[in-house]
């Protein structure tokens, strides 16, 4: 092998979702609309919860954090893809690739664990209602989320430091629309076993473990709901949990497939389709899922919109 090829990459070429030029206009229009809906929906949720003092509770504190993280996760990947689709410029410098990779995993880890925290919050509210205020205090929730952000920062930085030591030779074309660990690792001509082992360890900690905790929480919730004597009480409890279960299915259904399935099973098409789900579709749908069946949140959103209309008139 020639010495000149044994160097770190100066840039990568992100091939995007499709290599067919005739599809780029359609993809741009679709993802631009999805991104716009995501931005408006999540910012409205954050503003409504911040302004309405009745929503200053642990459940809505977690929801506001989830909306913020969803906004950041999508913003880290979608705008770059839109620029590539519009201009045809698919190149991304190596430092920018590492930065995008860092923030993708930073926000992805926070997203995953916050969803588990929300499940535990529902478990305490339904199974231990008399002790809810003591167990789930806002101060404790703030400490948990702060610790989570610090933990996510450390894990994401470790990923980047392990990636920065690799050497890339041959093709620098990435069959993806953003810089993720697995597609970039495939381009390295050095040993990536440490990186892959760390990915599995982290996936176990921040995907598999929260998912098991969610299943355990909802198993206990289901048992508690079945003991409720009135049909109205059971319906209210199911309604409280159904929106969160929809988010769990959307998020973990795709991330488990990408980070915990054997690489031999995961094709490039499946990998990109799964990435679209958790970087674009889920962040766009979450505001609708959480607000459609939540009267308190819908009321806060109406107040916010009416306030804006009144102030502008």
From Swiss-Prot:
Glycans are attached at residue 5. Residues 1-25, 80-100, 159-196, 260-272 are extracellular. Keywords: Cell membrane, Disulfide bond, G-protein coupled receptor, Glycoprotein, Membrane, Olfaction, Receptor, Sensory transduction, Transducer, Transmembrane, Transmembrane helix. InterPro entries: GPCR_Rhodpsn, GPCR_Rhodpsn_7TM, Olfact_rcpt. Odorant receptor. Residues 50-57, 121-139, 220-236, 293-313 are cytoplasmic. The lineage of its organism: Eukaryota, Metazoa, Chordata, Craniata, Vertebrata. GO terms for biological process: signal transduction. The keyword Nuclease does not apply. The keyword Membrane applies. Disulfide bonds join 97-189. It is a multi-pass membrane protein. GO terms for cellular component: plasma membrane. This is Olfactory receptor 1M1. It is found in: Cell membrane. Belongs to the G-protein coupled receptor 1 family. One of its GO terms (molecular function) is G protein-coupled receptor activity.
């Amino acid at each position: 092998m020639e010495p000149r090829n044994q160097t770190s990459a100066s840039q990568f070429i992100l091939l995007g979702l499709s290599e067919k030029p005739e599809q780029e206009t359609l993809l741009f229009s679709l993802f631009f609309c999805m991104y716009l809906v995501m931005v408006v929906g999540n910012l409205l949720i954050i503003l409504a919860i911040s302004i309405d003092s009745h929503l200053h509770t642990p459940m809505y504190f977690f929801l506001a954090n989830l909306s913020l993280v969803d906004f950041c996760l999508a913003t880290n990947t979608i705008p770059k893809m839109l620029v590539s689709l519009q201009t045809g410029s698919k190149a991304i410098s190596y430092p920018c690739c590492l930065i995008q990779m860092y923030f993708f995993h930073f926000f992805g880890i926070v997203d995953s664990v916050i969803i588990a925290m929300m499940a535990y919050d529902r478990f305490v509210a339904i199974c231990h209602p008399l002790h809810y205020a003591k167990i789930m205090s806002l101060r404790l929730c703030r400490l948990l989320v702060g610790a989570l952000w610090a933990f996510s920062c450390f894990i994401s930085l470790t990923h980047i430091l392990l990636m920065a030591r690799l050497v890339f030779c041959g093709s620098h074309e990435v069959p993806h629309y953003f810089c993720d660990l697995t597609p970039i690792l495939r381009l390295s001509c050095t040993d990536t076993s440490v990186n892959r082992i760390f990915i599995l360890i982290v996936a176990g900690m921040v995907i598999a473990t929260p998912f098991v905790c969610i299943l355990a929480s909802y198993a206990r919730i289901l048992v508690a709901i079945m003991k409720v004597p009135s049909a109205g009480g059971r319906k209210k409890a199911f309604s409280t949990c159904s929106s969160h279960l929809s988010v769990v299915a959307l998020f973990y259904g795709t991330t488990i497939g990408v980070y915990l399935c054997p690489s031999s099973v995961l094709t490039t098409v499946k990998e990109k389709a799964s990435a679209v789900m958790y970087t674009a579709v889920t962040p766009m749908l979450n505001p609708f899922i959480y607000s459609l069946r939540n009267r308190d949140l819908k009321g806060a959103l109406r107040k916010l919109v009416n306030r804006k209309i009144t102030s502008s008139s």
